């Protein structure tokens, strides 16, 4: 395919147009008075959201060069979301600010490599300064406060706080759609382990790339499944029940995996295969945990069992299983309460006798998986559109809350980024490195400027007053008051803030150091088909 190539200023200008189109769409959502964006969907009602990464992923531009710029900013939002679960709009605003300030200087003759060095040095200093002012989060009220700020709902904050209290900060919390109008919290027995599907063709939801199995059977074995004939009798029995199947095995390869995938694609039956969690003896113990939780039996040579001889009675069962590319969650296994209690007692006794810190940690993980359960936040709303929007907000809030517990919190509303300006400004750099530092200094102001603008205030006035205010004091854009941000509950997880800055600086630096851009040439429009010989053009008028 032929290529279009742009160089130096033309290349950067085209990419920046794409950066601006995406960033200008996303940044209207920032802050307590941020607006919503309506996204057209191929099927069903449009999606109304203020979630930065969701908006960024939807944007595709017609011009290939502009689209590359937009996609780089979308990558910033996605990366920030993957690391911290929130802060995607802040990351987008920071990227746009660094790109614009940097481009001015590059156009004026500054060296992009020197600018990049200065940006990297200034960003590292800002991140260390953010970590230094972070305050730890502990206690139910503090956790609820973080969640409430992110979701813009005190009720959601309470649900997330209670869920984390009941299943632990690292416990499994899932978000589902409720059948009613009200949002509610439910804790059910469940287990999560860090193994995802072996093939992406096994997913049932192509948008979220997850496989949801309702009321499935579960085959548990420490053997490798390579020959489909070994499990064919069992598959035929499961097929008769019209229920899905989860296969947990040492591995599924050879002819077995493509055969399972092909039958899944054809709709013959719904099957998902995952690798068994853990290694060695620990793997055997975890498989036994899963078997007891689900009421199944581990097919293993240790018990003299062979796959080809396995019957339906060896299969475990559960109310629901969700599998993504990295993990599997089993909810409401069918194992007996007595067997599960005995297994928990056994693990507790092993905890008391072990002398190894590593073994103790792994035993505690297994105990949490068996005893902790899974918290389910069931989201209710009057309409499907409102339901989707609420789910996205709760997902963001949950991720932000976990990030806050992990690394602590700082003053929200962009205040923390203004606070660290003093540390960055103190860096003694020269030449283009100093220019890079100054670019970051200007970018650190941008989130506050945008939050104020979205709330109807003049950003520059707010920033000037903020720089001269006592530490911790900030601008509450929701009320227009100057308050102690942390005491008022306007807080951001430091992990979210520093991830947004790091990812923005990284991608913006790449754009500034770009000297050539290569894109596919648009395909020429196909010519209209020739009219058959002898046909009178006037004959077409009747259609």
UniProtKB/Swiss-Prot annotation:
Its main location: cytoplasm. It comes from the Bacteria. Its EC number is 5.6.1.7. GO terms for molecular function: ATP binding; ATP-dependent protein folding chaperone; isomerase activity; unfolded protein binding. It is an enzyme of class 5 (isomerase). Keywords: ATP-binding, Chaperone, Cytoplasm, Isomerase, Nucleotide-binding, Stress response. The keyword Chaperone applies. ATP binds at residues 29-32, 86-90, 413, 476-478, 492. It is found in: Cytoplasm. Transmembrane segments: none annotated. One of its GO terms (cellular component) is cytoplasm. GO terms for biological process: protein refolding. It catalyses: ATP + H2O + a folded polypeptide = ADP + phosphate + an unfolded polypeptide. Pfam families: Cpn60_TCP1. Gene3D superfamilies: GroEL, GroEL-like equatorial domain, TCP-1-like chaperonin intermediate domain. PROSITE patterns: CHAPERONINS_CPN60. Forms a cylinder of 14 subunits composed of two heptameric rings stacked back-to-back. Interacts with the co-chaperonin GroES. NCBIfam families: GroEL, PRK00013.1, PRK12849.1, PRK12850.1, PRK12851.1. Together with its co-chaperonin GroES, plays an essential role in assisting protein folding. The GroEL-GroES system forms a nano-cage that allows encapsulation of the non-native substrate proteins and provides a physical environment optimized to promote and accelerate protein folding. Belongs to the chaperonin (HSP60) family. This is Chaperonin GroEL. The gene is groEL.
């Amino acid at each position: 395919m032929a290529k279009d190539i742009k160089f130096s200023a033309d290349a950067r200008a085209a990419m920046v147009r794409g950066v601006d189109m995406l960033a200008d769409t996303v940044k209207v959502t920032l802050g307590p008075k941020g607006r919503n964006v309506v996204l057209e969907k191929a099927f069903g009602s449009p999606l109304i959201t203020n979630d930065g990464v969701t908006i960024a992923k939807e944007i595709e531009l017609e011009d290939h060069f502009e689209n590359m710029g937009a996609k780089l900013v979308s990558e910033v939002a996605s990366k920030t979301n993957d690391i911290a679960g929130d802060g995607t709009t802040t990351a987008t605003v920071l990227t746009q600010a660094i790109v614009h300030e940097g481009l001015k200087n590059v156009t004026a003759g500054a060296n992009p490599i020197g600018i990049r060095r200065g940006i990297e040095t200034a960003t590292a200093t800002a991140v260390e300064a953010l970590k230094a002012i972070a305050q730890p989060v502990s206690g139910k009220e503090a956790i609820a406060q973080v969640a409430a700020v992110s979701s813009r709902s005190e009720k959601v904050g309470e649900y997330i706080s209670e869920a984390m209290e009941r299943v632990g900060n690292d416990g499994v919390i899932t978000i589902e759609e409720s059948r009613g109008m009200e949002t509610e919290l439910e804790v059910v027995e469940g287990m999560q382990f860090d193994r995802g599907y072996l093939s992406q063709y096994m997913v049932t939801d192509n948008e979220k790339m997850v496989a949801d199995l309702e009321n499935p059977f579960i085959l548990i074995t420490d053997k490798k499944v390579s020959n489909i004939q070994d499990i064919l009798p069992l598959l035929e029995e499961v097929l008769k029940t019209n229920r899905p199947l989860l296969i947990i095995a040492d591995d599924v390869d050879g002819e077995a995996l493509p055969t399972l995938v092909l039958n899944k694609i054809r709709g013959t039956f719904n099957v998902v295969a995952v690798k068994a969690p853990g290694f060695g003896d620990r793997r055997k113990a975890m498989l036994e945990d899963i078997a007891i939780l689900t009421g199944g039996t581990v097919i293993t040579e240790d018990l003299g069992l062979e796959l080809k001889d396995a019957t339906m009675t060896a299969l475990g069962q559960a109310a629901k299983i969700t599998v993504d590319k990295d993990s599997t969650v089993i909810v409401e296994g069918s194992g007996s309460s007595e067997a599960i209690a005995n297994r928990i007692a056994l693990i507790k006794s092993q905890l008391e006798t072990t002398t190894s810190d590593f073994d103790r940690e792994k035993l505690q993980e297994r105990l949490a998986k068996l005893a902790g359960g899974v918290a389910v936040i069931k989201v209710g709303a009057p309409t499907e559109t409102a339901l989707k929007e609420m789910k996205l907000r709760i997902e963001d809030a949950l991720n932000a809350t976990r990030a806050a517990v992990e690394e602590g919190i700082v003053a929200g509303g962009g205040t923390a980024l203004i606070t660290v300006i003093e540390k960055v400004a103190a860096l003694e750099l020269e030449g283009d490195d100093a220019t890079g530092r100054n670019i970051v200094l200007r970018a650190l102001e941008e989130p506050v400027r945008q939050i104020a603008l979205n709330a109807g205030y003049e950003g520059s006035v707010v920033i000037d007053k903020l720089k001269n205010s006592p530490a911790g004091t900030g601008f509450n854009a929701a009320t227009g008051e100057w308050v102690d941000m942390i005491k008022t509950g306007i807080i951001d997880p430091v992990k979210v803030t520093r991830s947004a800055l790091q990812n923005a600086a990284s991608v913006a630096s790449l754009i500034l150091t770009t000297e050539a851009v290569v894109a596919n040439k648009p395909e020429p429009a196909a010519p209209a088909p020739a009219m058959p010989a002898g046909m009178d053009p006037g004959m077409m008028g009747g259609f």
